């Protein structure tokens, strides 16, 4: 007999393990000024202690047998792979028979074979931010030195494909890009 209420709805929370930390400086980003809020700790990232506390409490608060962890940024891949491996260890520790799923949003520029193997082996859904064709994407999504990022993003997308990682795209729509949707 299930211990979950038949009318219960899942609780969804977005984790931001890097806060506003990012390797890009997109024109429309609402996080660019956030680092000024954390002058004493500009890297304002989630500690391992907070990670464990959050995972335990988030799983225990669920009223459904499936738990979804959504990792968002800043740029989520600015945290080392070891951080996410630890997160999965903690998810297993506190799962209590629940199914745990993970999805992560990235700008794609830091994807490597190692990251993609991890995502594939652990069945993560990866969202990649790409703002349409190169001429539109590069107009808005530049690195901190003002250089365009489209080529790096496409390299990341190709790595996801190479490794068979399930992925989706996130696109910031503007009037000129809507015909491409």
Annotate each predicted stretch with a short phrase.
Residues 2-4:
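Long amphipathic N-terminal alpha/beta scaffold segment
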Residues 7-49:
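Canonical Radical SAM [4Fe-4S] cluster-binding loop centered on the CxxxCxxC motif
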Residues 17, 73-74, 106:
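Short glycine-centered, acidic/aromatic-flanked micro-motifs in structured strand/loop junctions
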Residues 20, 24, 135, 179:
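Glycine-centered loop/turn positions within well-structured domains
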Residues 25, 29, 114, 139-140, ...:
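Residues that scaffold the ATP/ADP-binding catalytic core of kinase and kinase-like folds
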Residues 42-46, 76, 145:
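Pocket-edge positions in alpha/beta enzyme catalytic cores
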Residues 55-70, 79-173:
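Radical SAM/AdoMet-radical enzyme domain recognition
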Residues 172-181:
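Single conserved hydrophobic/aromatic residue that forms the stacking wall/gate
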């Amino acid at each position: 007999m299930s211990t979950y209420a038949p009318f219960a709805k899942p609780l969804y929370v977005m984790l931001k393990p890097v806060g506003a930390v990012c390797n890009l400086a997109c024109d429309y980003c609402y996080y660019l000024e956030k680092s000024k809020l954390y002058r004493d700790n500009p890297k304002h990232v989630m500690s391992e202690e907070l990670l464990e506390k959050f995972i335990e409490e988030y799983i225990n608060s669920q009223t459904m047998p499936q738990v979804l962890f959504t990792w968002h940024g800043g740029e989520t891949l600015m945290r080392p792979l070891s951080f996410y491996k630890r997160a999965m260890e903690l998810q297993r520790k506190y799962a209590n028979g629940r199914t745990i799923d993970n999805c992560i949003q990235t700008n794609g520029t830091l994807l490597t074979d190692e990251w993609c193997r991890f995502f594939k082996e652990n069945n993560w859904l990866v969202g990649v931010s790409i703002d349409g064709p190169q001429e539109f994407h590069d107009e808005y999504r530049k690195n901190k030195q003002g250089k365009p990022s489209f080529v790096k993003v496409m390299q990341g997308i190709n790595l996801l494909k190479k490794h068979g990682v399930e992925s989706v795209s996130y696109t910031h729509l503007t009037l000129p890009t809507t015909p491409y949707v």
